[in-house]
Amino acid sequence: MNVLVTGANGFIGKNLIVHLNELGMHTIAYTRENSTQELPDLIKKSDFIVHLAGENRPKDEKDFNTVNAGLTTSICKSVRALGKKIPILLASSIQATFDNAYGKSKLDAELIVKRFESDTGNPVYICRLPG
């Protein structure tokens, strides 16, 4: 199985990649160094997507939405364009219920994948992590 991991250089991403590789899975890393233009080719090679990438300390609060909701939108659009169902696990935050820019951006990302699942039948899983 080929697993695309966004946020692959983060704490969870690095450890998840090690674990998945130990289980014999092939991992595809997507980091801040990648561009969204690379996503379609990476997704084309994927059987499962673990979307961990997110912004939590931007210089400008607008970057919360650009990264947290924008990248999620790009992933969903790329999967839709392929015409095949690729399960997506979205790492969200318990702060998705908070009234702040970070929480709103995480909630927006959740709503994007839920709408994507509703529109396409593509499996989506959301994990609200603490912190």
What is the meaning of each model-derived region?
Residues 15, 19, 78, 112:
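Rossmann-fold NAD(P)-dependent oxidoreductase module
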Residues 25-34:
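Conserved glycine-rich Rossmann-like NAD(P)H-binding loop of the short-chain dehydrogenase/reductase
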Residues 6, 49-53, 88-93, 127-129:
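SDR active-site strand-loop-helix element
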Residues 1-23:
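N-terminal Rossmann NAD(P)H-binding glycine-rich loop of SDR-like oxidoreductase domains
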Residues 73-108, 117-120, 124-125:
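Conserved Rossmann-fold NAD(P)-dependent oxidoreductase catalytic core, especially the SDR/UDP-sugar
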Residues 1, 25-26, 86, 122:
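A structural micro-motif
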Residues 35-74, 78-80, 94-98:
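NAD(P)H-binding glycine-rich loop region in Rossmannoid oxidoreductase-like domains
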Residues 4, 28, 125:
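Conserved beta-strand positions in the Rossmann-like core of class I SAM-dependent methyltransferases
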